[in-house]
UniProtKB/Swiss-Prot annotation:
(6S)-5,6,7,8-tetrahydrofolate binds at residues 112-115. This is Methionyl-tRNA formyltransferase. Belongs to the Fmt family. Keywords: Protein biosynthesis, Transferase. It catalyses: L-methionyl-tRNA(fMet) + (6R)-10-formyltetrahydrofolate = N-formyl-L-methionyl-tRNA(fMet) + (6S)-5,6,7,8-tetrahydrofolate + H(+).
Amino acid sequence: MKIGYFGTPEHSAKLLKALIDSTLAEVLFVVTNPDRPKGRNKKTEAGPVKKTALEHHIPVFQYESIKREKEKALSDFGSFPADLYVVFAYGSILPKEVYECPPLSSINLHGSLLPDLRGASPVQTALWKGYSASGITIQYIGEKMDEGDILLSQKIDIIPEDNTETLMNKITDAGTESILRLLKAYDGKPFPAIPQNHAKATYCGKIKSEDRILDWSLGAEELHNRIRALYPDAIATTRFREKRIGILKTKLSSLSIESNPEPGKLKRLDKKGLLTQCGDGRFLEILELQPENKNRMSASDFLNGFRIQEGETFG
């Protein structure tokens, strides 16, 4: 099957590579976001999907706004008679004229069990809300975001140690396997699909900068879920000795709940462990953190370097 591929980040590049390597598909062209400045030097750099495409000599198209530039895009794609467009984390909404262009239309890999968690942050939101399971959905692209008919879906278990990085790995693996299975089953007819139950739809928005700031008056489990939802793309932060510090990895402590909690209070756990008290009286064990202008470090390295004093707090 001849495919046009739309995607941008690392996980999308993994799916692209699987399609390139498969005998089931021929990737005719790739559409990805424009190159952006990255790193401390702000050097303009191609994204992972573009790099993968160029390594395999596949034509690449980039648009600042595919909605505003749809006529150019349609002209560009006209030289490549794709049967199907596959979309995974492209970063922009496709105009109707684009997604209806190929004979088999366009499909999207979404990181939740639709109609639950339609929107921009399904993976982060599933973790933030403390879900024990989520999944993937392959859907036709329609006029409204994530409301298209469903071709395939698969449940994925979430463990307490998962964060956005590990859950995205699971989603990418499951989504890749599902799309390859779909292509293998193709019999020359349009892919069968079922409508979503719109009455059961839930939604999630983009992560905001203020979402990163930890409020230690909240409960320990809620804070733990927020920290793992934000890692690694938007690190959770707090304040310590008038400087910002990133909290990268935590776990819930089994220490006894205190009836008169002091939210943000720091407590040593033997010589290597660091605990922070939360608003519900429970403690959150800090496993990895990153002080401002320093490299990430373990809790034991933080304790050795900063000499925590009795009564000091995060917040």
